[in-house]
Amino acid sequence: GSKTAKANVNLSTADFALDHYVAVTTEGQSAGVEQLFAADFNQKIQASNAQNHSRNGVVKLLKKQKGEKLNCTVSTDIIEESADYRIAKVTLKFENFTKTDLVTLERVGNDWKVSKSINSYK
């Protein structure tokens, strides 16, 4: 069998998936990172030099940050949702700046996955 045991993360609802995404991106959680992101996941960073990150790059980075808690206040707003689709705005307030992450979640089979993330800073 494979050496890395699959962490069993419950992604059966959009709420669970979104909570897990926040835990992974802000609290250094690394369990179930692979399951969380859709195969075609893409991350865009809106900045003076806009960047695009593939699924592999983001998964790698998040695994590297395992255990690192960001020093910020997190708030989540649901912008739009349907039975198979949800867009949420995750706001990370740091001392000197705010990061806004627009997250798109989609139902894939029985699980919810993050398919897109657009970050901006102010």
Residue spans for each PLM region:
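Short, well-ordered alpha-helical segments enriched in acidic and aromatic residues
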Residues: G28-K44
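Short, low-complexity N-terminal intrinsically disordered segments enriched in polar/charged residues
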Residues: G1-E27, Q35
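Hydrophobic alpha-helical segments typical of transmembrane helices
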Residues: A17, V74-S75, D101
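A short gly/proline-enriched turn/hairpin at secondary-structure junctions
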Residues: N42-Q51, G67
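Surface-exposed, charged secondary-structure patches
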Residues: N10, H53-F97
